[in-house]
């Protein structure tokens, strides 16, 4: 299982703590040092069944400075995926990718129902 996170993010820290406390093994990946690629994001989006907007870090400074709230509705899905792949700080975190699931953000109840 792959955990894509930003170490300074308090939500990511909580997620890692939850995984550790529950004895769930994962491989850690720093979202800025190795941001998700276009191909990865496209695959994970398809597997997740979630709307693509859920992959955006809507509370992030980068999202707000680019005024993406207004721009995203006019962009194609392909353009949005390419944009996400340009900067890890645009991506909602943590991202957890398993063989048959993708989690966007930390939701302990959702994680527990799949991982325990």
For each predicted feature, which ranges?
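Thiol/selenol-based redox catalytic cores and closely related redox-interacting motifs
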Residues: 33-116
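Local sequence-structure signature of Cys/Sec-based thiol-disulfide redox active-site neighborhoods
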Residues: 1-22, 26-31
């Amino acid at each position: 299982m792959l955990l894509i996170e930003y170490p300074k993010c308090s939500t990511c820290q909580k997620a890692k703590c939850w995984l550790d406390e529950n004895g769930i093994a994962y491989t850690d990946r720093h979202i800025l040092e190795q941001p998700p690629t276009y191909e990865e994001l496209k695959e994970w989006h398809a597997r997740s069944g979630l709307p693509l907007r859920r992959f955006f870090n809507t509370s992030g400074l980068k999202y707000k400075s680019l005024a993406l709230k207004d721009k995203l509705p006019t962009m194609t899905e392909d353009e949005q995926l390419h944009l996400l792949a340009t900067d890890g700080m645009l991506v909602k975190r943590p991202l957890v990718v398993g063989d048959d699931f993708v989690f966007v953000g930390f939701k302990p109840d959702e994680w527990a129902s799949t991982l325990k």
